[in-house]
Amino acid sequence: MNQTVYLYTDGACKGNPGAGGWGVLMRYGSHEKELFGGEAQTTNNRMELTAVIEGLKSLKRRCTVIICTDSQYVKNGMENWIHGWKRNGWKTAAKQPVKNDDLWKELDALVGRHQVSWTWVKGHAGHAENERADDLANRGAAQFS
């Protein structure tokens, strides 16, 4: 039986670049798990990507995964842009190197292990799970600020 896991992810950055954190609320049925971490010198986009990566890395077996993020950057990157980047040797349409390609490549490999769908949620709009992911990301950032 294929399990459905919800990953609510968020990233935070104090300064951009600066101290940053990532947070994940994982939900499978009635089970929940919280993950968070951070880095001393990073960007908000790197933390958004890292949140999804860490959530996927924590899954022990193949799952149906619904990723709920407030990051259009992450959602658009995985649903639209990544195909062209890979085709163009990790260059943008303007022939520039893709920013954060190390994380995009890792995320792409992890997504390939699961059946993943992407959902965008408006950040800071009272979405309970997104607010929890945001709190976790801020806890991760606080370790370095």
Curated annotation (Swiss-Prot):
Top-level class of the enzyme under EC nomenclature: hydrolase
Binding site for Mg(2+) 1: 10, 48, 70
Pfam families, per database record: RNase_H (PF00075)
Cofactor binding note from Swiss-Prot or TrEMBL: Binds 1 Mg(2+) ion per subunit. May bind a second metal ion at a regulatory site, or after substrate binding.
GO MF assignments: magnesium ion binding; nucleic acid binding; RNA-DNA hybrid ribonuclease activity
GO terms of biological process kind: DNA replication, removal of RNA primer
Domain of life according to the entry: Bacteria
Assigned EC number: 3.1.26.4
Cellular compartment(s): Cytoplasm
Cofactor(s) needed for function: Mg(2+)
This protein's UniProt keywords: Cytoplasm, Endonuclease, Hydrolase, Magnesium, Metal-binding, Nuclease
CDD domains, per the entry: RNase_HI_prokaryote_like
Keyword Hydrolase listed: yes
Protein name per UniProt: Ribonuclease HI
Organism: Neisseria meningitidis serogroup A / serotype 4A (strain DSM 15465 / Z2491)
Gene: rnhA
